Swiss-Prot record:
Pfam families named among the record's database cross-references: DAHP_synth_2
Localization per record: Plastid, Chloroplast
GO biological process, alphabetically ordered: amino acid biosynthetic process; aromatic amino acid family biosynthetic process; chorismate biosynthetic process
Descriptive protein name: Probable phospho-2-dehydro-3-deoxyheptonate aldolase, chloroplastic
EC number: 2.5.1.54
Transit peptide per record: 1-58
Gene that specifies this protein: DHS1
SUPFAM superfamilies: Aldolase
Reactions catalysed, as given in the entry: D-erythrose 4-phosphate + phosphoenolpyruvate + H2O = 7-phospho-2-dehydro-3-deoxy-D-arabino-heptonate + phosphate
GO terms of molecular function: 3-deoxy-7-phosphoheptulonate synthase activity
């Protein structure tokens, strides 16, 4: 399974005395052991609006409905209007490439996607915390160096969230597939070459290869690498950061906890302590590519898009009658919906109904991106609409994309204070609405300032957080989780 780099922190649910409130269980991402909850509060991380499912549906009925649905939409997306798809100049070459991809083994397996959906269902019920992150857009030529840095950043964020927030963390990376991005302009100029502005590396292939002096055969060797086991990590980068002392304090507390576990016979050599789980995700944009990697699962008979464990539909492609929504309703992967201040509450309810007609927990994650001011005004209406429809979703805040501005040099940047303001607004709104939230971020390992942006701006789309900012955000969220936990425990009988 692939790796993520920084944080997409989801949210958690306030305790409720309603009869449908589930019994709480700890689920560790890398083990099946269970612990008795410390109190009546849910532990962590995805905001689940506290309403029961609209219509209780048995597993057999849900499977039958899903099979019927899949058989009807496997090819039907081609008859719908598809925005943001490039105009391929040579359909013959395109067909040849798609047939080659169809013959490839899957990048992920259906069972893995099902496992992620189960974990996201725990997040939707308030029993886990979603940590999602990665570059806005990937490049074929630097995957391996980036993955190493992302893994270090994610490990430090996860450590702070798990130990500081006392909750299991689900780690999902925006990687091993986030090569294509929708753009406002169909073409853009780069070093004298006019490239497709819509879809990046997979579309402007020959021009990019010419520009970067990188042969397609070499680039293909770098497309994806999946890891299922963690390795020792070098976290020296925190020693000289503003958060270094806080992180070292946390490390000492973790060491004390490990000492206690060792005394109880659970050492760091135990398989539970030596492995971890990472999941991949990307935007479902290039539909011919996505269909070429879609496979029927022999176990369930369902279709899974095996290009990633989780897919999402973007702000520019989420039309109810569009090709992207039509395709996504036909695959059984966990799905995300990107939502801005433009989203109408009723439209969101209808979109969730289309993508998750059986109201299955873990199927839908709503990723909100609209800036701090819009968050306080628009988000309450979205939460109330979804809650009123009785829909089970995981709410996530993406504070990056709503805070992109242009620096004087013309390059894009994001003010960290604006990012923090949106995160705080997201938490405040959910607290106001009776739920408690989290965040998604795109992060990296380089500090980018106005002064050195021209020489250190290596991202292929929008700017990243650096490692220090990513860690700082994790500290802020974990400390808020701990504070809220203390308040809830103080009021527990």
């Amino acid at each position: 399974m692939a790796m993520s780099n920084t944080s997409a922190l989801a949210s958690k649910l306030l305790p409720s005395c309603k009869p449908h409130q589930p019994t709480l269980t700890f689920f560790s991402p890398s083990t099946t052991c269970q612990k008795k909850p410390r109190s009546s509060r849910p532990i962590s991380a995805a905001v689940h609006v506290t309403q029961p499912p609209k219509t209780p549906i048995s597993s057999a009925t849900a499977t039958k409905r899903r099979l019927s649905l899949l058989n009807g939409v496997w090819e039907s997306w081609k008859s719908k209007k598809a925005l943001q798809l490039p105009e391929y100049p040579d359909e013959g070459k395109l067909d040849g490439v798609l047939k080659t991809i169809e013959a490839f083994p899957p990048l992920v397996f259906a069972g893995e996607a099902r496992s992620l959906e189960e974990k996201l269902a725990q997040a939707a019920m308030g029993n886990a915390f979603l940590l999602q992150g990665g570059d806005c857009a990937e490049s074929f030529k630097e995957l391996m160096p980036l993955y190493s840095r992302y893994f270090q950043n994610t490990a430090s964020d996860e450590c702070r969230l798990t130990f500081g927030g006392q909750c299991p963390v689900i780690k999902v990376g925006r990687m091993a597939g986030q090569f294509a991005k929708p753009r406002l302009d169909p073409f853009e100029e780069k070093d004298g070459l006019w490239l497709s502005g819509a879809n990046g590396w997979p579309v402007a292939w020959e021009a990019y290869c010419k520009l970067q002096q990188l042969s397609p055969s070499r680039a293909l060797l770098l497309v994806v690498c999946c890891y299922a086991e963690s390795h020792p990590m070098d976290l020296d980068f925190v020693e000289h950061s503003e958060q270094g002392d806080r992180y070292q304090e946390l490390a000492h507390r973790v060491d004390e906890a490990l000492g206690f576990m060792d005394a109880c016979g659970l050492t760091v050599d135990h398989p539970i302590m030596a492995t971890t789980e990472f999941w991949t995700s990307h935007e479902c944009l290039l539909l011919p590519y996505e269909q070429a990697l879609t496979r029927e699962d022999s176990t369930s008979g369902l279709f899974y898009d095996c290009s990633a464990h989780m897919l999402w539909v973007g702000e520019r492609t989420r039309q109810l009658d569009g090709a992207h929504v039509e395709f996504l309703r036909g695959v059984a992967n966990p799905l995300g919906i990107k939502v801005s201040q433009k989203m109408d509450p009723n439209e969101l309810v209808n979109l969730i109904e289309i993508l998750n007609p059986t109201n299955k927990p873990g199927r839908i994650t709503v990723i909100v991106r609209m800036g701090a001011e819009n968050m306080r005004v628009k988000l309450p209406h979205l939460i109330r609409a979804v809650r009123g429809a009785g829909q089970i979703v995981t709410w996530v805040c993406d504070p990056m994309h709503g805070n992109t501005i242009k620096a004087p040099c013309g390059l894009k940047t994001r003010a960290f204070d604006a990012i923090l303001a949106e995160v705080r607004a997201f938490y405040d709104v959910h607290e106001q609405e009776g739920t408690l939230p989290g965040t998604e971020c795109v992060g990296g390992s380089r500090t980018i300032t106005y002064d050195d942006r021209q020489t250190r701006y290596h991202t292929h789309c929008d700017p990243r957080l650096n490692a220090s900012q990513s860690l700082e955000l994790a500290f802020i969220i974990a400390e808020r989780l701990r504070k809220e936990e203390s308040v809830l425990n103080a009021h527990s009988p």
